[in-house]
Amino acid sequence: MNWTELSIIINHEAVELATNILENHGSNGVVIEDSDDLINQPEDKYGEIYALKKEDYPDKGVRLKAYFNEMTYDDKLRQQIKDELLNLDELDQHNIQFSEQIIAETDWENEWKNYFHPFRASKKFTIVPSWETYAKEADEELCIELDPGMAFGTGDHPTTSMCLKAIETYVLPQHSVIDVGTGSGILSIASHLIGVKRIKALDIDEMAVSVAKENFRRNHCETLIEAVPGNLLKDETEKFDIVIANILAHIIDEMIEDAYNTLNEGGYFITSGIIKEKYEGIQSHMERVGFKIISEQHDNGWVCLVGQKVSE
């Protein structure tokens, strides 16, 4: 399977909304190459500096790179994305540029290695690419070794980072966890590192399940996490203490009742992938079903909600 890389150069003011548009239309990740980063080359959180190459960045503005399955990226989708971008009030229409290229599946892993380095994703969790060596800064630091492959979920997106923070807060070793839309398996691995013994990881994409299994192996938990293809929670008959879902808002909306029914009394529904424009609707739906909202995180236009199943 090949992938279409859609590259868009836009002004800074439109980056957040443009990223949301690309992800809402199914982009498997968005790379942000900001020309300002060349001026303010940051030191990463664990004390090493990665030199940036001028040729990798636009002369001005921001380059967004979005990745779509070549089989589903057609003229209709291309035009929908372009129309929505051009309708943004924040967009400087005189300086927007579009380009595309095909990336073969065999090139995909190496493409992502250019952007993925160890980083602290939350208070406890550090994400470490499988091809790099990293020394822990503290005994309590929990390292997740990851190769995102085709499934992404590297932990650097605000939704994943917020889910990791929620896992730190609400998941206990005695809990059972089901991770819906596991992707790279990062949230299941985090639950394992917390000490959870019963974890089930679902994804409708069999390739994602395969990538997740490989990441479980890298983190020495392949025999401890059940990874299977699954269509949300529609066929789930088991009960769990924690349901985690970091997926698109409209899919979350479809599964709220099933999440409630899957949880044990007092259990938690940790969910993100929700843009700020849609979170009030998701929150209201959760409350109508019976969830008590106990946590609400916001980060760069994204929201993570935690609802608890409680009886009246």
UniProtKB/Swiss-Prot annotation:
Gene3D superfamilies, per the entry: Vaccinia Virus protein VP39 (3.40.50.150)
Keyword vocabulary terms for this entry: Cytoplasm, Methyltransferase, S-adenosyl-L-methionine, Stress response, Transferase
CDD domains per the UniProt record, alphabetical: AdoMet_MTases (cd02440)
Catalytic activity: L-lysyl-[protein] + 3 S-adenosyl-L-methionine = N(6),N(6),N(6)-trimethyl-L-lysyl-[protein] + 3 S-adenosyl-L-homocysteine + 3 H(+)
GO molecular function: protein-lysine N-methyltransferase activity
Cleaved signal peptide residues: none
Record-level GO cellular component terms: cytoplasm
InterPro entries hit by this protein: Ribosomal_L11_MeTrfase_PrmA, Ribosomal_PrmA_MeTrfase, SAM-dependent_MTases_sf
E.C. number: 2.1.1.-
Pfam families with a match to the protein in the record: PrmA (PF06325)
Subcellular location: Cytoplasm
Binding site for S-adenosyl-L-methionine: 160, 181, 203, 246
Recorded superkingdom: Bacteria
BP GO annotations: methylation
Protein's UniProt keywords contain Methyltransferase: yes
Induction (free text): By heat shock.
Keyword Transferase attached: yes
Function, in words: Methylates ribosomal protein L11.
Family to which the UniProt record says this protein belongs: Belongs to the methyltransferase superfamily. PrmA family.
NCBIfam families linked to this entry: prmA
Name assigned to this protein: Ribosomal protein L11 methyltransferase
Organism (species): Staphylococcus aureus
